[in-house]
Every structure is written in C-alpha cells, then in structure tokens.
A protein has these predicted regions:
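Membrane-embedded catalytic cores of phosphoryl/pyrophosphoryl-handling enzymes
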Residues: 2-9, 114-210
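Alpha-helical transmembrane segments in multi-pass membrane proteins
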Residues: 17, 82-86, 90, 94, ...
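N-terminal transmembrane-helix/juxtamembrane module of multi-pass inner/ER membrane proteins
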Residues: 1-63, 98-119
C-alpha cells in the first residue's frame, strides 16, 4: 500500500475513533483509571508524567543532536532536529487548543462534553493531551527515519497516552485528539527533515572545511 494512502486511512480511522469516543469516554476512562489504581505507581507515574514530558523529550533530542554532530552522523542529526521541531510545534499547538476549549479533566467528575471556553485554569485544559501530542509527534519522526522499529516506537507513544488516562488527567478522546495532532505535526516535519538531510550535510561539511 502506498505510504500516502496508508497515512490517509490511518488519520481517517483516528478521526472516526474521536467521533465515536463520547459514548466510550466514561467507561474506558474508568477502566484505565482502575489500572492506575491497581498497578504499580512508579510504572504509571513514569508513563503519565515523565516519559511524555516535552521538556525531557527536547533535552534528550538536544543531546542526541550533539552526539550526532560530533560523530558526523548526518541522518541522526536530521532526525534529532526534526524530532525537536515536532515536539516544539505540537506542544505549542496543544497548549493553545486546550486553553481555548476549556474541557474539564476526568478527576472533576464532570461530563467530557461540558466545555467552558477560553481559560487559564489547568483543571479545564483536558483536550487535547499535550503529552500524547508531543509523544506521537516525536514517534512520527522517529518512525519515518527508522520504519523497521515503527511498531515499537508507536507502542511507546501509546503507553504514554494510556498512562495519561490511568492517572485521571485525560479522557480517551483527549489522548486520541493529541495523537492526531501529534501525527499531523510530526509527519510533515519528518518528511521535511528527511528531504533536507543532504543539504544539511553539505552545509556542515562546508563549515568543517572553513
């Protein structure tokens, strides 16, 4: 199947899940929260907070880019820069959207359909999940550069999303919305980073010879 058609079908499937999720939000969110209550706290804490934290992702990518520079690994460098851009852009977009929508978090016990509009109250910034957005944006870039490990990369991103539900921070549709936002951000940036890899290599070699 051509990659373009696969992407279109993938996005269509995610959007259908989001449209269907109002009926599934409450029961599936409660199920995932029970996992968080019954499972080891460190495991879900790692998934819910640290693994998908944009700042840590950017720090790791910066170290990766630095190592790639010293080792003269241009594919690594292009991937790290593309991933950094994906995390930044998806993170900013998710913050803008969630503060404009004003959706309550599950722990408040309110309906996921109850929106209050623009707000700075963090209790009403549920949609979309910023952790899911940055994780799936980064996953899109990594999978684009390293397709053989795509299933494992996206599994890690999904683990972060489930952790956000298990912690009571998000509904299912928040995570799905964040995943779609992340993929729509990450894939174009991955494509751009891949295409500019040769140009980046030429510029850096010119810099070395100067």
């Amino acid at each position: 199947m051509p990659r373009k058609i696969f992407h279109q079908l993938f996005f269509a499937g995610l959007w259908l899940l989001i449209l269907a999720s109002p009926a599934l939000d409450q029961p599936l969110t409660q199920t995932a929260r029970s996992w968080g209550q019954d499972g080891p706290g460190w495991y879900w804490g790692l998934a819910a907070y640290w693994a998908g934290l944009g700042g840590l992702q950017m720090a790791a990518l910066a170290l990766w880019a630095l190592a790639a520079w010293f080792l003269r690994q241009w594919v690594w460098l292009a991937c790290a820069l593309g991933g950094f851009a994906a995390v930044v852009v998806s993170g900013i977009l998710s913050q803008v959207i969630k503060h404009l929508m004003g959706r309550p978090r599950p722990r408040l016990g309110l309906s996921p359909l109850e929106l209050i509009g623009p707000t700075l109250n963090s209790d009403f910034t549920s949609f979309p999940s910023g952790h899911a957005a940055t994780s799936f944006a980064l996953a899109a870039v990594l999978a684009y550069f390293y397709p053989r490990g795509a299933w494992l990369i996206f599994l890690a991103a999904a683990w972060v999303g489930v952790g956000r539900i298990a912690s009571g921070s998000h509904f299912l549709s928040d995570v799905l919305g964040g995943a779609v936002l992340g993929l729509m951000t990450g894939l174009p940036l991955a494509y751009g980073a891949m295409r500019r890899q040769g140009l980046l290599q030429k510029k850096l070699r010119r810099y070395d010879s100067a």
